[in-house]
Amino acid sequence: LDRSSAASDVYKRQQLNYQKMKEAAKYFVGEHDFKAFKSSGTSGKNSVRTIYNVEVKKEGERIIIELTGNGFLYNMVRIISGTLLDVGLEKIKPEDISHIIEEKDRTKAGKTLPAHGLYLVNVKYEEWV
């Protein structure tokens, strides 16, 4: 999230609670049914994924969100980021993340953030034997 980018409209220059975002990130780690974090209307029955790490970092005016996992649902990263943004804006509490995951209700998760500023950094594959 960069205050100089078009994505800045999403949080309208409000101060984000970076520490709460970092705290909330840990609730995504592990194997969960991420049904609440995929676009509504998306086909596919299996929404179980494993998130190995979610890191929230501050670099100047930017907040960087890095996710590592075994796969991602359609718009999952954008919705997780939108949910972390809601935590940073103090619309929801960090511990609410576990309830959103349990309830599997898309309407409880954050907005789907725009793709602007979203980058795929690395893809790793296990060796095939």
For each predicted feature, which ranges?
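Core RNA-modification/binding signature centered on pseudouridine synthases
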Residues: 15-129
